[in-house]
Amino acid sequence: MGQSMSGTRRASLRIEGKVQGVFFRESARVEATRLGLTGWVRNRPDGAVEAVVEGEPAVLEEFIHWCHRGPAQARVSGVQRTDSKATGEFSQFNVERTS
């Protein structure tokens, strides 16, 4: 992790709607990796998807904008977001097991 974390941010997201069974997690992984973001995404038992994402603020905004749409089969009804300082604990973006 030799790069400086200054300027990097963390966003914790909860994505609601028709977001499970529509390849949302894998599509999010592909999009986050394309953008150079790190973190994880997983399904929640209540039908939502949650993600923790770290990266440069402008790139995070691009990913969050994508989350409001999701893949073609998804129907996103809302995205809740909490911002914080990045920890640098992630080296890539992964799909995690359901919480």
Swiss-Prot record:
Q: Which PANTHER family match?
A: ACYLPHOSPHATASE
Residues of the Acylphosphatase-like domain: 10-97
Keywords for this protein:
Hydrolase
- What domain of life does the UniProt record list for this protein's source? Bacteria
- MF terms per GO, please? acylphosphatase activity
Give the EC number(s) under which this enzyme is classified: 3.6.1.7
- Membership in a protein family: Belongs to the acylphosphatase family.
Which InterPro entries does the record cross-reference, listed alphabetically?
A: Acylphosphatase, Acylphosphatase-like_dom, Acylphosphatase-like_dom_sf, Acylphosphatase_CS
Q: Where is the composition biased (Polar residues)?
A: 89-99
**Which residues lie within the region annotated Disordered?**
75-99
Q: What is this protein called?
A: Acylphosphatase
Q: Which organism is it from?
A: Myxococcus xanthus (strain DK1622)
Q: Which gene encodes it?
A: acyP
Residues annotated as the enzyme's active site? 25, 43
Q: Kindly name one Pfam family recorded for this protein.
A: Acylphosphatase
Catalyzed reaction equations:
an acyl phosphate + H2O = a carboxylate + phosphate + H(+)
